[in-house]
Design a protein with these regions (language model features):
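Surface-exposed, glycine-biased beta-strand/turn segments
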Residues: 95-207
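Extended, charge-rich intrinsically disordered regulatory tails
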Residues: 235-253, 259-282
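Bacterial N-terminal signal peptides that target proteins for export
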Residues: 4-16
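Cationic-aromatic interfacial patches
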Residues: 29-102
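Zn2+-dependent peptidoglycan hydrolase active-site motif and core
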Residues: 192-227, 255-261
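Short, well-structured beta-strand-loop connectors
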Residues: 188-199, 231-246
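Extracytoplasmic
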Residues: 38-40, 48, 65, 77-79, ...
Length: 282
């Protein structure tokens, strides 16, 4: 069965059954998926009695209860394959089609020159910091907080969206991978879901004050341009705990929170996760 969605919240359950020719017995496995089948989307799944599951031949962490999660990056292909093996060694395959998104063009002026074309003397620092951030996002713990509804981490105006192609002072740069929430410096930032602090640095070159939380199975969330960090690496954070304060550190033109969600190396759209929360309240 081919699954295709127009990017909206999708919830489906399919029963995959195989008649056993050698006997009159009958075995079946139910696959449940919830999330957004679109670029930038996060999808949670559940399979009972499965011993392994993979997406495009990449193994996914599987909880004792059969929970797993995966996501799609900004420019990922639109066709994917989910495979799994049950406890009896039977293999299954599920094609998945996702929608392609169009992204806005975001032209930003007034950015300090040192952040548009950094001087050579800071190149080693930038590379070192990028490696540290990537390492923090490689965490693949057994936590299951990614199953919980996601709350908005700060009050304020949405000033930037996921996926937009950015131009700084007229020069093209990498797309934006977060959701920007503008508010005054010192405004509180709260944990949108529970997790563990895996990265907390007050002064990175591009992102300024930077915080990363682990939510399990390769899902992390990132908070940047912070003026103050209230937590440290190793802290266990409950949903709604104050973790930081909005700032204007790093490459910015004004105070705001740049909030990001990640599945391993893929950047996901936080706005879609908040849509899920709103849908659950209806």
């Amino acid at each position: 069965m081919k699954v295709s969605e127009k990017g909206q919240l999708v919830m489906f359950k399919t029963l995959l059954a195989t008649a056993l020719v050698a006997s009159a017995s009958f075995s079946a496995m139910a696959l449940e998926l919830k999330g957004h089948l679109t670029q930038g989307g996060l999808v949670t799944g559940k399979l009972e009695n499965a011993k392994s599951v993979s997406l495009n031949d990449e193994n996914l962490k599987l909880s004792a209860q059969g929970d797993f999660v995966f996501g799609f990056g900004r420019d990922t292909e639109t066709t994917h394959t989910l495979k799994w093996v049950d406890n009896n060694g039977k293999s299954y395959s599920q094609p998945i089609a996702i929608t392609k998104r169009d992204y806005k063009i975001d032209k930003i002026t007034g950015v300090a020159k040192k952040y548009v074309s950094p001087p050579k003397e800071v190149s080693a620092r930038i590379s070192r910091e990028a490696v540290a951030v990537r390492k923090a996002r490689e965490v693949n713990s057994d936590l299951l907080y990614f199953l919980d509804p996601v709350l908005k981490p700060a009050e304020g105006r949405i000033s930037g969206v996921y996926g937009s192609q950015r131009y700084f002072n007229g020069e093209p740069r990498r797309p934006h991978f977060g959701l920007d929430i503008a508010n005054k410096t010192g405004s509180p930032v709260y944990a949108p879901i529970s997790g563990t602090v895996v990265f907390a640095e007050p002064d990175l070159y591009y992102s300024g004050g930077t915080l990363i939380l682990d939510h399990g199975h390769g899902i992390t969330s990132t908070y940047i341009h912070l003026s103050k960090l209230d937590v440290k690496v190793g802290d266990k954070i409950e949903q709604g705990n104050k973790v930081a304060e909005i700032g204007a550190t790093g490459r910015v033109t004004g105070p705001h929170l740049d909030w990001r969600f990640n599945w391993k190396g893929e950047r996901l759209d936080p706005a879609l996760l908040m849509q899920d929360t709103l849908a659950n309240k209806k």
